[in-house]
Swiss-Prot record:
It comes from Phomopsis amygdali (Fusicoccum amygdali). It is an enzyme of class 1 (oxidoreductase). This is Fusicoccadiene C-8 hydroxylase. Keywords: Glycoprotein, Heme, Iron, Membrane, Metal-binding, Monooxygenase, Oxidoreductase, Transmembrane, Transmembrane helix. The chain crosses the membrane at residues 16-36. GO terms for cellular component: membrane.
Length: 524
C-alpha cells in the first residue's frame, strides 16, 4: 500500500512536468509516424527519389529559402541520379522528359487540370484567376480576360505601349554624356510596371518611368517578395499572420510596402468606378474611344461574369497578381536580353543594322508590332532570350483530379501534383546545340520540330500565361527603340553575364543575390 501511495505522490509531484512533456512526446511520435507513412506507405512511395525529400517539405525549404532558390538545381541532380521521374517532396513528382510535356500541360478539352493549393494559399491571392485551384472555376474567371490579352486586342492597345516606349527613350537620353551610372534593371521594372498600370487601371498619378531614378523601391519590393515565396508557399499560415500586422507598423518596418498598398487602393478605386459606370449605363460610345480608354477591369466588369465573381475584393487580388506577374517576368527577360546584346558586338551591330531603316523616323513614326515582328534578327534575339531566361523557371505543378496519368510504366495517382521546368526543356542538349550559349542565329538556321516542341517560356495548356502577346509586344517595341538609330548609346558599366542570368530559381527567377544590378552609362 505504501509503495502505491509513493507512486501516486511521485506522479502528483511531477504532474506539471508530465503536462509539459506530454504534448512534446505526442508531437514527436506523430512526426515520426508521418515520416514513416510518407516514406513507406504513401501512394507515391513507389516512385524514385531521395528519402529525405519524401519525408518532409523542409528539404525543399532549406534549398530554396536558405540556399537562395537552388532547389531547381537539386531536382536536376535528382533526375541525373534517379531517372526522368522523381519524387521531389512528400506530395509531388517532377518529370524531365520533353515527350511528356504535352501530356501534362493540356487544354480543357483534353483533361481538367487543377492547380496546387499552396500557390494561392501562400500568397493569399486565391481570388485571382491564376491562383484558382479548381479547373472549372479557373476557366470561369479566366475566359472573360482572354479577349483583352489577345493579339488583336494588343494591336488596338499599341498606342499606349508606344507612348510609354517614347517616354523610356527620352528618360534615358537625359543621361547622355553625363557619365552617370544608371540601373537598367530598375528602368525595365519601371517600364513593365507602367505598362500594367496603363492597361489595368490607367491611373494618371502613377508613373515609375517619370520618377527621378525610376523608383528603385518598386524593383526592390518585388525582389524581396520573390525571395520570401519559398517560406510563404510551404507555410501558408505565415502570410495570414503578416496580414494581421497593422499597415502602419508594416510600413515602418519596410516603407517600400506602402507602394503595394497604394497599388491595391488605386485598383480598388478604379474597380469601384468601373462598376458604378456600368450601373449608370455609361459605356464606350465607339471603338476608338474604347481603344484609347478601356482598361482590363473595365473589360472584366462589363463581361458576363456572375456578380459573385465581380466583388471588389476579388478583383483587387486579380490586380495585384497581374501587376506582380506582368512586371517581374517581362522585366527579367529584358534584363537578360540587354546584357547579352551589349556584351556581344556582332549581335548588337547586326540588330542596329536591321533596325536602321524601320526605326529611322522614331519617335514621330513608330512601326507597329506587326511590322516589327517580321524583323528576323530582332525576333531571334528575343526568342533566344526567352529560351535562356523565361519569366517562370519554377516547375509549375499540375493536378489531374479525375484521371490517372501514365508515364511509361508509371501510373501517377489522381490528385498528384506533377511539374516540369521550362529551364529543363530549354537546356536539353539533344535539342539545342550548346544550350547554355546565347545564339540567336539558332532560330534562323536549321530549326527542328523538337526545338519548337521544347520551347515553352509561357508554358502550355489551359493555364498558359495570359500575357504572351503583351510580353512579346512590349519587349519588341522596347528593344527596337533602344537599338534603333535614335536610341540611346548604352554601355555596360562593371556588369557581366552573371548580373542578368537567372541564378536563383524561386517561383520567379532572379540573378545572383549579390549582384549590383545591370549598370550602364549613356554615351554622347
Amino acid at each position: 500500500m505504501s509503495t502505491l501511495q509513493g507512486l501516486l505522490d511521485a506522479l502528483q509531484h511531477h504532474k506539471l512536468q508530465l503536462l509539459c512533456i506530454g504534448p512534446l512526446v505526442y508531437a514527436c511520435v506523430s512526426f515520426i509516424i508521418k515520416i514513416v507513412y510518407r516514406i513507406y506507405f504513401h501512394p507515391l512511395a513507389k516512385f524514385p527519389g531521395p528519402k529525405i525529400a519524401a519525408a518532409t517539405h523542409l528539404y525543399e525549404v532549406a534549398w530554396d529559402y536558405f540556399g537562395q532558390g537552388a532547389y531547381l538545381y537539386e531536382i536536376q541532380r535528382m533526375h541525373e541520379k534517379y531517372g526522368p521521374i522523381v519524387r521531389i517532396n512528400p506530395i509531388e513528382l517532377s518529370v524531365n522528359d520533353p515527350e511528356f510535356y504535352n501530356v501534362l500541360y493540356v487544354g480543357g478539352s483534353v483533361r481538367k487540370t487543377n492547380a496546387l493549393p499552396s500557390f494561392g494559399d501562400g500568397m493569399d491571392f486565391n481570388g485571382s484567376h491564376g491562383m484558382t485551384v479548381d479547373h472549372d472555376h479557373h476557366r470561369l474567371r479566366r475566359k472573360p480576360m482572354e479577349p483583352f490579352f489577345s493579339k488583336g486586342s494588343i494591336a488596338r492597345l499599341e498606342d499606349r505601349l508606344q507612348e510609354l516606349t517614347v517616354t523610356l527613350v527620352q528618360r534615358l537620353h537625359e543621361y547622355r554624356g553625363t557619365g552617370r551610372v544608371l540601373r537598367l534593371d530598375h528602368v525595365f521594372a519601371a517600364m513593365a510596371g507602367d505598362v500594367v498600370n496603363v492597361l489595368c487601371i490607367a491611373n494618371p498619378t502613377m508613373s515609375f518611368l517619370r520618377h527621378s531614378d525610376f523608383n528603385p523601391y518598386w524593383y526592390e519590393l518585388f525582389h524581396t517578395l520573390i525571395r520570401s515565396m519559398p517560406l510563404f508557399m510551404n507555410f501558408p499560415w505565415v502570410i495570414k499572420i503578416v496580414r494581421l500586422i497593422p499597415t502602419s507598423l508594416l510600413e515602418k518596418l519596410d516603407p517600400r510596402s506602402q507602394m503595394f498598398r497604394d497599388w491595391r487602393m488605386m485598383s480598388v478605386n478604379h474597380i469601384i468606378d468601373a462598376k458604378q459606370r456600368k450601373e449608370r449605363g455609361l459605356i464606350f460610345v465607339n471603338e476608338e474611344d474604347k481603344m484609347k480608354c478601356e482598361t482590363l477591369f473595365d473589360h472584366i466588369v462589363n463581361s458576363d461574369l456572375p456578380e459573385a465573381e465581380l466583388s471588389v475584393e476579388r478583383l483587387a487580388s486579380e490586380a495585384q497578381v497581374v501587376m506582380g506577374a506582368g512586371t517581374v517576368t517581362t522585366a527579367r527577360t529584358m534584363d537578360f536580353l540587354a546584357v547579352r546584346i551589349l556584351l556581344n558586338d556582332s549581335v548588337c551591330q547586326r540588330l542596329r543594322d536591321e533596325l536602321r531603316e524601320p526605326m529611322k523616323d522614331f519617335p514621330e513614326r513608330i512601326p507597329s508590332y506587326a511590322e516589327l515582328e517580321k524583323l528576323p534578327w530582332l525576333q531571334a534575339c528575343i526568342k533566344e532570350a526567352l529560351r535562356l531566361s523565361p519569366g517562370l523557371t519554377h516547375r509549375l505543378p499540375r493536378v489531374s483530379p479525375h484521371e490517372e496519368l501514365i508515364y511509361k510504366d508509371w501510373v501517377i495517382p489522381r490528385n498528384t501534383p506533377v511539374g516540369m521546368s521550362a529551364l529543363f526543356m530549354h537546356m536539353d542538349p539533344l535539342v539545342y546545340k550548346d544550350p547554355t550559349e546565347y545564339r540567336p542565329e539558332r532560330w534562323l538556321e536549321d530549326v527542328t520540330p523538337e526545338m519548337h516542341r521544347n520551347y515553352v517560356p509561357f508554358t502550355k495548356g489551359s493555364r498558359r500565361c495570359l500575357g504572351v502577346e503583351l510580353s512579346y509586344a512590349e519587349i519588341t517595341l522596347v528593344f527596337a527603340s533602344l537599338f534603333g538609330p535614335k536610341g540611346p548609346k548604352l554601355k555596360l558599366y562593371e556588369t557581366n553575364e552573371s548580373d542578368g542570368d537567372p541564378a536563383c530559381h524561386f517561383l520567379l527567377p532572379l540573378p545572383r543575390l549579390d549582384s549590383k544590378g545591370i549598370r550602364v552609362t549613356v554615351e554622347a
